[in-house]
């Protein structure tokens, strides 16, 4: 696990990830989390997501109720891997600090990541490595198909809660229930 120092994950998050990994493994997708903050009124906001239409996002439908969809932005300030994924990460260019930039090794160039800073690249991990056809990244989140709501068990907390109150940033401005209700 890689985790930025101001992120909180729960036991429920770990249980979700473990179960979802089994479901998603055959598709080469990785269960992901959504970084959230609470505002002064205790409403939950997605830190780095925009409003989307669920039917425009790449997704895998698991049953009549749940799908796993690519979030607009896979940044989650962490990654959580089992042994197999960690081995893949450590034995690939995704663990190289130059990954994405390509300045020292052109084989590590990734246009999606070229402008990421070192901390952002560290959390990306395998998101952009061996992406299944039709997807934007390997990271997917569980969404209730009927309600178009992100499932609570994949929400992780950004402890400072600094973005929802900051009027000078676009981070933390979309209510969690509105992410797929555009």
Language-model features and meaning:
Residues 83, 91-182:
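C-terminal catalytic/acceptor-binding lobe
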Residues 4, 49-62, 138-150:
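A broadly tuned preference for mixed-charge, low-complexity surface segments
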């Amino acid at each position: 696990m890689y985790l930025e120092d101001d992120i909180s994950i729960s036991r429920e998050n770990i249980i979700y990830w473990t179960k979802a990994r089994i479901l998603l493994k055959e598709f080469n997708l990785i269960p992901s989390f959504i970084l959230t903050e609470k505002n002064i009124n205790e409403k939950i906001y997605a830190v780095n997501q925009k409003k989307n239409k669920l039917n425009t996002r790449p997704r895998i439908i698991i049953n009549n109720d749940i799908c796993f969809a690519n979030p607009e932005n896979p940044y989650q300030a962490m990654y959580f891997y089992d042994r197999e994924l960690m081995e893949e990460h450590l034995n690939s260019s995704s663990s190289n600090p130059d990954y994405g930039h390509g300045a020292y090794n052109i084989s590590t160039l990734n246009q999606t990541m070229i402008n990421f800073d070192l901390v952002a690249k560290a959390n990306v991990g395998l998101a952009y490595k061996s992406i299944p056809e039709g997807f934007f990244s390997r990271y997917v989140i569980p969404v209730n198909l009927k309600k178009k709501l992100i499932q609570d068990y994949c929400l992780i907390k950004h402890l400072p809660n600094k973005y929802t109150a900051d009027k000078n940033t676009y981070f933390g401005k979309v209510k969690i229930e509105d992410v797929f209700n555009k």
